[in-house]
Amino acid sequence: MAKKSKIVKNDRRRATVARYAERRAELKEIIRSPRSTPEQRTAAQNELAHQPRDASAVRVRNRDAVDGRPRGHLRKFGLSRVRVRELAHAGQLPGVRKASW
């Protein structure tokens, strides 16, 4: 079980990312666009640099939905590998079967 503070901090980061996502996308488009002038590009880079660090999506950590475990996360289930194994053995994951070949 992860510390509650780490889970809350990650949730706060998700909210910050969502709040700044649209403006970040606009600024990045200006920076990437060959049609933007060097002044526009510099202004966009400056504004992007002055946004909070946590506004970047790469700072959000994928965590287990049940206990917040940060490692071994499987996106398909939103759970850690440990939790997937436990739930699969208990038959609580629909469509998941133990491999046999």
Swiss-Prot record:
GO terms for cellular component: small ribosomal subunit. Residues 29-60 are annotated as: Disordered. Keywords: Ribonucleoprotein, Ribosomal protein, RNA-binding, rRNA-binding. One of its GO terms (molecular function) is rRNA binding. Transmembrane segments: none annotated. Disulfide bonds: none annotated. It holds the Pfam family Ribosomal_S14. GO terms for biological process: translation. Residues 34-45 have a biased composition (Polar residues). Part of the 30S ribosomal subunit. Contacts proteins S3 and S10. HAMAP family: Ribosomal_uS14_1. Belongs to the universal ribosomal protein uS14 family. Binds 16S rRNA, required for the assembly of 30S particles and may also be responsible for determining the conformation of the 16S rRNA at the A site. This is Small ribosomal subunit protein uS14A. It comes from Mycolicibacterium paratuberculosis (strain ATCC BAA-968 / K-10).
